[in-house]
């Protein structure tokens, strides 16, 4: 599935806009990870465990969005975006969304 952040795809003619598609996931941090991150905050540097967690969440959200687009019969997703929000003290939601389209044959 072709996914792009642009509103169109060079060399392709959009036939039909099928609608908005999205995928989301909520991930909770581990208490031990939070403690280690607090220590890392004091000395500085990348919080690798959080980076890995967010990377996995982005991939899961994107995979779910692509599945939704495939279920609609889409050829691609344009105007792709991510959004992240904190929904609890130790949990974050990642949403991937865009517009599912069909190409002219």
Language-model segments: which ranges?
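N-terminal presequence-like segments and the immediate start of the first folded domain
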Residues: 1-33, 71-75, 92-105
């Amino acid at each position: 599935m072709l996914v792009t952040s642009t509103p169109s795809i060079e060399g392709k003619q959009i036939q039909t806009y099928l609608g908005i598609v999205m995928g989301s996931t909520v991930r909770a941090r581990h208490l031990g990870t939070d403690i280690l991150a607090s220590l890392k905050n004091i000395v500085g540097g990348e919080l690798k465990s959080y980076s890995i967690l967010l990377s996995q969440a982005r991939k899961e959200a994107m995979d779910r969005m692509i599945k939704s687009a495939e279920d609609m019969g889409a050829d691609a997703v344009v105007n792709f975006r991510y959004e992240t929000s904190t929904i609890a003290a130790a949990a974050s939601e990642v949403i991937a969304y865009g517009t599912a389209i069909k190409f002219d044959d």
